[in-house]
Amino acid sequence: MTALVIGGAASGKSAFAEQLAVSLSDGPRCYIATMQPFDDECRARIQRHREQRAGKGFATLECFTGLHHAVPPEKSTVLLECVSNLAANELYSPDGAGDGAVEAIVEGVRSLRRRCEHLVIVSNEVFSGGSSYAGDTLHYL
């Protein structure tokens, strides 16, 4: 099964996605983390998510770019969080795919889907935070 969980910032989508992933299988679980720890705010959010996942049986795999290189356990339940961060990383990181970001992400998701039993994907609802965006932001959206 593949599920997409979307919502605004701090909307509870992470907790919902974790609960869904846990309910899908008692087998191996893998959390693919895409947020880079750029600053104190990011590090604090990452720590909160780690604490929230504690005791739920998730192995964590950090993957900031190149999702197709991520190798979760066969037949596992994978929680990919979050596609919005992954897109920003692919578009703007020096080691990202740049203009090939969409293709890189789609291929990465396809690769995960072939390998895992269940895939839960988390993404931000990008238009919940405003309606007027500059050129680079529109390209990202």
Q: Where are the model-predicted features located?
A:
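Conserved P-loop
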Residues: 2-73
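Short, functional N-terminal and low-complexity linear motifs
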Residues: 12-19, 77-78, 110-119
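Generic beta-sheet signal
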Residues: 3-5, 29, 76-85, 117-121
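Helix-adjacent hinge/juxtasegments
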Residues: 51, 56-101
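General N-terminal targeting signals
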Residues: 20-22, 46-48, 78, 95-97, ...
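Short secondary-structure boundary segments
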Residues: 8, 35, 82, 123-125
